Amino acid sequence: KKISGMDRIFFTNSGAEAVEGALKAARKYAFLRDGHTNHDIIAMNHSFHGRTMGALSVTGNVHYREAFEPLIGNVKFADFNDFESVKTQVTDKTCAIIFETVQGEGGIYPATEAFIKQVRALCDERDILLILDEIQCGMGRTGTMFAWQQYDVKPDIMTSAKAIGCGVPVGAFLMTEKVAQQSLTSGDHGTTYGGNPLACTAISKVIDLFEEQRILENVKETGAYLYKKLDELTIKYDCIKAHRGVGLMQGLECDMSVNGVINRAIQK
């Protein structure tokens, strides 16, 4: 709780499993409140949440979805960082809104402060759960332990994985006490290896290393340096159309094929 700001945690084996658990918690929360009437989920275009059926259903990229449709129903898509687009999708049947705090595969787009605060306020007003996916952007990558901590908001449910175990397969979804008490109960969800001793030892060590090696401070310092240098490249080369990101999660948008650049970078 001290690190994440959340109250309860359920350990999984991967990020996709964490998303599955988060979606189930949201659906169960709405079911206990309203029965089978309010089960719609709003996700974002160009998002990525995983390749299992539930996670894929809230992934807004046809490249991943097409071969596996029809997917889980009652999912609507809105445009990221466009509050009006989200608002128009909300109805009395909406139970959750899910998005990455920083869209990764979608092009390195951090949520704007206005967008995330407006969505949070809308969720509070309509008793809709806000699910923030921190699987790619969390664990210090943006300069804070979780990217949402840079905004004056808090999710109802958060997903985490990847760097949380530093290479050991582990994921988690975290909830506020309110959601935990009014959603999943014993038998609603399970995992064979989630929370196993090896995984939890790895997580514990990763957390220790964050403090011992001043990782967050280093991300802020090196992130500022990277931002400055990428800005210089953006000015220097016409083929670079945009520079976006925060901390060490940054990217360049180019109007040319970048395969050669990527291969050279890997070699170097």
What function would you assign to each model-found segment?
Residues K1-K268:
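Conserved N-terminal phosphate-binding loop of PLP-dependent enzymes in the Aspartate aminotransferase
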